[in-house]
Amino acid sequence: MRVLVQRVSSAAVRVDGRVVGAIRPDGQGLVAFVGVTHGDDLDKARRLAEKLWNLRVLADEKSASDMHAPILVISQFTLYADTAKGRRPSWNAAAPGAVAQPLIAAFAAALRQLGAHVEAGVFGAHMQVELVNDGPVTVMLEG
C-alpha cells in the first residue's frame, strides 16, 4: 500500500462537477492519495492510517492528530504505475478494484476511529482534484 501525502491549505475533489470531498481554506490539512497492491491487507491499511494521523508534517512540526486537521482520502491506482518498459505505463502492480476498494475504505475508517475528520473521493470514478500544496510538502508512505 502506498499513500502519497500532501500538506494543503485547501483541496476539493469533484465527480461529475459536484464536490464530493473538500478541505476548506481556513487552515491546514492533508490530502492522501492511496494506492493498493497485491498482498495488501486490513492490518497494513490500519497501520498506515495511524502513521498518517501522527505524521508531523503540519505547521510547527505538528501532526493531523495534534491539530485536528482534516484529511481528504482519494483512491489512486496510478501510484503503482510501472514505467520501466516502453512509453505506456503498466498497471499490473495495482490491486484490482474488488481488492482495493475495501482496503481504501478500511484506511479511511481507521482514520475516523483515530478521531480524524475524513472526506473522500469516489472509488473508481473519474475525479477532478484541486489542491493548494502548502510548503510544498509531499511525502510517500509505504507499508
UniProtKB/Swiss-Prot annotation:
Similarity comment: family membership: Belongs to the DTD family.
Protein purpose: An aminoacyl-tRNA editing enzyme that deacylates mischarged D-aminoacyl-tRNAs. Also deacylates mischarged glycyl-tRNA(Ala), protecting cells against glycine mischarging by AlaRS. Acts via tRNA-based rather than protein-based catalysis; rejects L-amino acids rather than detecting D-amino acids in the active site. By recycling D-aminoacyl-tRNA to D-amino acids and free tRNA molecules, this enzyme counteracts the toxicity associated with the formation of D-aminoacyl-tRNA entities in vivo and helps enforce protein L-homochirality.
N-terminal signal peptide: none
Cellular compartment(s): Cytoplasm
Keywords: Cytoplasm, Hydrolase, RNA-binding, tRNA-binding
Molecular function, one GO term: D-tyrosyl-tRNA(Tyr) deacylase activity
Stored Pfam families: Tyr_Deacylase
An example Gene Ontology CC term for this record: cytoplasm
Further information: Was identified as a high-confidence drug target.
E.C. code: 3.1.1.96
Comment block on domains: A Gly-cisPro motif from one monomer fits into the active site of the other monomer to allow specific chiral rejection of L-amino acids.
Self-association state and partner proteins as the record states: Homodimer.
Substrates-to-products reaction catalysed: glycyl-tRNA(Ala) + H2O = tRNA(Ala) + glycine + H(+); a D-aminoacyl-tRNA + H2O = a tRNA + a D-alpha-amino acid + H(+)
Protein name: D-aminoacyl-tRNA deacylase
Short motif Gly-cisPro motif, important for rejection of L-amino acids, span: 135-136
PANTHER family on file: D-AMINOACYL-TRNA DEACYLASE 1 (PTHR10472:SF5), D-TYROSYL-TRNA TYR DEACYLASE (PTHR10472)
Example of a GO biological process term: tRNA metabolic process
Organism in which the protein naturally occurs: Mycobacterium tuberculosis (strain ATCC 25618 / H37Rv)
InterPro entries: Daa-tRNA_deacyls_DTD, DTD-like_sf
